[in-house]
């Protein structure tokens, strides 16, 4: 029995050291989800200013892209739990050609949407950027003019 415990502990130590070697840890104040690191910045910026800020942080960093319900849930929890009263929060989705063709700033596939009911509605033909809608608990999206000022979430792949 004692030898089994020693071998088990040895295998556990090897597993933990190898899993740490993958580099799946995000820097302090960033959260990890599905192979990416995210951080909310409370500074209020336009969509383009926020995207440029993210890009300046490190190569490959952009406004956050969401590709499944679990992505939305993790970010909604993070914002709600750590940034009370943040208001709407920019994500990396926008309609660059103003034809209701939504694309992520990191150029990943646009295969998932979580629009709030009645959205996107393109009020005054001027809503071409997307934020997480605060009244939905950050689970739903709304289109908004890109010049609006909001906090934002940056993201980069591990």
UniProtKB/Swiss-Prot annotation:
Q: Which Gene3D superfamilies match?
A: Mannose-Binding Protein A, subunit A (3.10.100.10)
Q: Which GO terms describe its cellular component?
A: extracellular region
Q: In which tissues is it expressed?
A: Expressed by the venom gland.
Compartments annotated for it: namely:
Secreted
Q: Extract the SMART domains matched here.
A: CLECT
Any Pfam family from its record, for instance, is Lectin_C
Q: Which domain of life is it from?
A: Eukaryota
Q: Which is one GO molecular function term here?
A: metal ion binding
Q: List the disulfide bonds.
A: 26-37, 54-154, 129-146
Q: What residue range is the signal peptide? A: 1-23
Is the keyword Calcium in the record?
yes
Question: Which of this chain's residues are annotated to bind Ca(2+)?
Answer: 127, 142-143
What positions does the domain C-type lectin occupy?
Answer: 33-155
Sorted keywords for this record are: Calcium, Disulfide bond, Hemagglutinin, Lectin, Metal-binding, Secreted, Signal, Toxin
Q: Does the keyword Ribonucleoprotein apply?
A: no
Q: Where is this motif: Mannose-binding?
A: 119-121
Give the protein's biological function: Mannose-binding lectin which recognizes specific carbohydrate structures and agglutinates a variety of animal cells by binding to cell-surface glycoproteins and glycolipids. May be a calcium-dependent lectin.
Please give the family membership noted in the entry.
Belongs to the true venom lectin family.
This protein is called what? C-type lectin lectoxin-Enh5
């Amino acid at each position: 029995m004692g030898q089994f415990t020693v071998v088990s502990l040895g295998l556990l130590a090897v597993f933990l050291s190898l899993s740490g070697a993958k580099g799946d840890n995000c820097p302090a104040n960033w959260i990890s989800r599905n192979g990416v690191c995210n951080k909310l910045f409370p500074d209020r910026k336009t969509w383009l200013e926020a995207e440029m800020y993210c890009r300046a942080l490190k190569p490959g960093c952009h406004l956050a892209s969401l590709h499944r319900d679990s992505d939305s849930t993790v970010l909604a929890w993070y914002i709600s739990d750590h940034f009370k009263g943040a208001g709407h929060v920019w994500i990396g989705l926008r309609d660059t050609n103003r034809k209701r063709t939504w694309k992520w700033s990191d150029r990943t596939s646009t295969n998932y949407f979580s629009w709030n009911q009645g959205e996107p509605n393109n009020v005054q033909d001027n809503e071409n950027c997307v934020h997480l809608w605060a009244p939905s608990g950050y689970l739903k999206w709304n289109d908004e003019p890109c010049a609006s000022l909001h906090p934002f979430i940056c993201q980069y792949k591990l």
